[in-house]
Regions:
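Gram-negative bacterial Sec-dependent N-terminal signal peptides
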Residues: 1-22
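Proteolytic maturation boundary segments
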Residues: 23-61, 241, 247-314, 318-319, ...
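Metal-associated gating/positioning segment near the N- to mid-region
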Residues: 86, 98-106
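Hydrophobic, small-residue-rich alpha-helical packing segments that form membrane-like cores
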Residues: 161, 168-237, 241-243, 248-256, ...
Length: 802
């Protein structure tokens, strides 16, 4: 569980309710799909086979080519914590554990070793989760070998009705579940529960968290587990999904063989979600948790959830509001970068909460001293959009991004991964939605998107925020006895402030061009690996590895000699500050916001990061935008913006970062352990809050600017491209920059093998928290990662511990 947030729907995929890993289809296919949906019902993915066994179990089979020789299984059981009574709160989740601990075909302790013998790892290949209204078992099967297939389905069948639920096994698991309860317990989790109790009053959600209660975890008798298991784990409440490198006939045979013998049931249980109590007046609520990371303010409208059938009309009905929130969030994103903005971040959106409530929300994160100004800022920005709407430039940018996302989804659909498909099909089944392809999604929505007007978006946003009373909530780590009254006063005062129409920024053209193209001066082919290595005339090395398993997706990394070990010795944490400067600063001639407008509709972007030895500039693109991506990445290499934008956001966040670390066990480890292990070497210790705050942009420029322009560099490109096509593009971009060093600098021995503590001690570390949580860490001193064979063996050893 994560802290409660109502996130807006920013990605274009949100306009298309089905899963969209992506795919390839021509214009005529889209038109054909559009005709087929004229009747009003979305067309199911034609490769998906849906059926039902005589016993009532529903199954879905989806042949899929990637990854080859593998398949994925999802067993979804239509039950979760909402089906629990007071005396069994947590049994749904507890059962999820128990099915691994003794079943028809596996005595307690036998299942996991049997899985490992066939190459299935718990956590990686096999996992499960419990939610309010479902329990889902997942297995990604690494082989089509008969013994592996048999094991996978035997286990899944045992999950379905073969759990032994032995009393000794239940008692042994109680401590593990208690530990998980404590791991989940956090300031954010506690704040979320208080927010839910306000927002979802009347529903059963605030009283039915999947982890349950400690009393039930520690004392629930075996008969409670058995009764729940036999009541809800029945064929009519199950959906089985198989997706992978299989034929429909294989899938059907497996379903019948392993699940056909389950007995038909007469399930009559009705899940009670309760009835949302809608607000009858505007209310204000102050929530205090002294260990909360930050202060957050939100304005929320909750309405009872209305189940809508999955029709073309209903899918399209949501588009104007989703686009309105996307444009509103772009405004908020731009605002946050201004030095005088009172908030760190803000966003708005609509979310359905477990089919119990539909919530529209706008929320912000801020420093405590700025909460009133932050609340006023989001209230007025929302009201500005409702009163004056959006302009054509904003809509054009949003439309370009939606169109690009849809087209990219279509292009890459052919190489969608089976594990993603299996999970998406299971979730479509859970929501009673038609599982559709990206081609179908775009056929449904394209006309609406292309003809959408600013006025339609404005009207949708206005409708969302009209006819209901908001709940205004502030959560903080500060006590405020008059908090609710102060919230209401600040909110009412903000409502009286006049707002003006939004002024859009003018769009610019991309400024950067490079010199004369470079040339390839050396070329090496490693045919067994399918790798081409180039040396360009300016010294840049290039590694090219075309692949076919991710259609129309290309990854590009510039690795420049330097990295964390090149940092000034005493500048602990400067790499954190540098990441903010480089990722938030845009280019010399363009801010990040300008680049977002310039590149709207293109699949391009650059992220800065670093390893111990290299500065990295990384991006992902497609064939159509490949040259633009290389131009952009080269511009980041040679002309970083070093703007204040990223620094402004980081400085606002620093107090929250350290407050969180002060009150969490992971923070205590991060702040204290490196100093112990590396004898207070500032290269490896976490910076103090004062030190991180003191850094300036000049410190970053002095560190990284010259290396980015001059140091040895390797360019690595992997993905769906042709080697001969990309070489001229490389020559015109990264090959056109000035000459660089032809080899990495030699690393000083004190950096290669820093002095470490003697590993013959134990130490207790403390941190300030009211939450009872302890972490035990063991450290072994090993050689560095330069010996690849040893590093792999150590990784295998590490895997053995899990």
């Amino acid at each position: 569980m994560k802290a409660f947030t109502i996130t807006s729907i920013l990605a274009a995929a949100c306009l298309f309710p089905s899963y969209s890993p992506a795919g390839a289809a021509a214009e005529n296919k889209i038109q054909a799909a559009s005709m087929q949906t004229a009747a009003g019902i979305p067309k199911q993915d034609p490769q998906l086979i849906k059926g039902k066994l005589a016993n009532g179990l529903t199954y879905f089979i989806r042949p899929n080519a990637e990854p080859k020789g593998r398949f994925s299984i999802r067993l979804r059981v239509n039950t979760g914590s909402l089906n629990e009574t007071d005396d069994i709160q947590g049994v749904s989740h507890f059962l999820e554990h128990m099915v691994f601990n003794g079943s028809t075909h596996f005595k307690r302790g036998e299942m996991i070793p049997a899985m490992q013998k066939e190459g299935l790892g718990l956590g990686g290949d096999a996992n499960a989760y419990t939610a309010f209204d479902e329990t889902v078992y997942m297995m990604d099967v690494p082989s089509m070998k008969e013994s592996t297939v048999d094991l996978a389905f035997t286990i899944m069948r045992d999950f379905a009705d073969g759990a032994l639920l032995e009393e000794s096994a239940i008692d042994a698991e109680r401590g593990i579940i208690t530990s998980e309860y404590k791991v989940r317990d956090s300031a954010g989790y506690r704040v979320m529960k208080e927010v839910f109790s306000i927002m979802l009053d009347g529903t059963r959600i605030p009283d039915r968290y999947p982890i349950g209660t400690l009393e039930v975890i520690r004392t629930a008798p075996r008969e409670k587990f058995i009764n729940y298991y036999r009541t809800h784990y029945v064929p009519s409440q199950m959906q089985l999904v198989i997706a992978g490198d299989i034929t429909p006939e294989q899938g059907k045979a497996w379903v019948e063989k392993y699940f056909g013998s389950m007995k038909k049931d007469n399930y009559s249980f009705q899940t009670d979600r309760g009835t949302l109590k809608t607000a009858t007046e505007t209310t204000a609520h102050w929530i205090t948790n002294k260990e909360a990371t930050s202060t957050e303010a939100s304005i929320n409208i909750a309405r009872p959830y209305v189940n809508k059938p999955d029709t073309v009309a209903n899918r399209n009905k949501d588009i104007p509001l989703n686009v309105a929130y996307a444009m509103l969030n772009r405004r908020l994103e731009k605002m946050a970068k201004n030095a005088d903005c009172p908030f760190i971040s803000a966003e708005g959106g609509r979310a359905d909460i477990v089919e119990a409530a539909e919530v529209d929300s706008i929320q912000t994160q801020a420093d405590y001293k700025n909460w009133k100004a932050a609340l006023a800022a989001i209230e007025q920005e929302l009201r500005r959009a409702i009163e004056f709407g959006f302009n054509k430039e904003e809509l054009a940018e949003a439309r370009s991004n939606i169109t690009a996302a849809a087209e990219n989804a279509i292009k890459s659909w052919a190489t969608a991964k089976s594990e993603d498909l299996a999970s998406a099909i299971a979730q479509s089944a859970a929501r009673d939605k038609v599982f559709t392809t990206p081609q179908e999604d775009w056929a449904i929505s394209r006309e609406v998107v292309e003809n959408l007007t600013p006025e339609q978006c404005q009207a949708a946003l206005k409708e969302a925020w009209t006819g209901a009373f908001p709940r205004v909530i502030v959560t903080s780590n500060k006590e405020n006895s008059q908090g609710s009254a102060e919230i209401m006063k600040a909110y009412r005062e903000s409502q009286t402030a006049k707002v003006q129409p939004y002024q859009a920024d003018g769009r610019k053209d991309f400024s950067y061009k490079f010199g004369d193209p470079g040339k390839v001066t050396a070329r090496t082919e490693t045919t067994d690996l399918g790798v081409t290595q180039l040396t360009l005339s300016n010294g840049v090395r290039v590694n090219l590895k075309p692949t076919e398993f991710d259609k129309d997706s290309i990854n590009i990394t510039f690795a420049v000699d330097g990295g964390e070990l090149s940092r000034p010795e005493k500048a602990s944490g400067l790499e954190l500050f540098a990441n903010a400067v480089m990722n938030g600063g845009g280019l010399k001639d363009h801010s990040n916001d300008e680049l977002a407008a310039i590149m709207a509709g293109k699949k391009v972007g650059v992220g800065f990061s670093m390893t111990d030895r290299f500065f990295l500039l990384s991006g992902n693109t497609n064939r159509e935008d490949l040259e633009t991506q290389l131009q952009l990445q080269t511009a980041y290499l040679m002309h970083p913006g070093y703007r204040q934008d990223g620094v402004t956001l980081l400085r606002r966040a620093i107090p929250m970062i350290y407050n969180k670390m002060d009150h969490e066990v992971q923070g205590a480890m991060k702040k204290q352990v490196p100093a112990i292990l590396y004898r207070n070497n500032p290269r490896f210790t976490f910076p103090t809050q004062e030190q991180l705050t003191s850094y300036q942009i000049k410190d970053v420029r002095d560190w990284v600017d010259a290396p980015l322009k001059n140091n040895y560099m390797e360019v690595t490109v992997t993905g769906d491209f042709r080697t001969e096509d990309i070489i001229p593009l490389l020559e015109r971009t990264v090959g056109a920059v000035p000459k660089r060093a032809e080899a990495p600098a030699t690393l000083d021995e004190t950096l290669r093998h820093p002095a470490m503590a003697d590993f013959n001690f134990s130490k207790d570390l403390t941190y300030d928290s009211s939450i009872d949580k302890t972490m035990v860490c063991l450290f072994w001193k090993t050689p560095g990662g330069e010996n690849k064979k040893l590093a792999r063996r150590l990784n295998m050893l590490k895997a053995g511990f899990y």
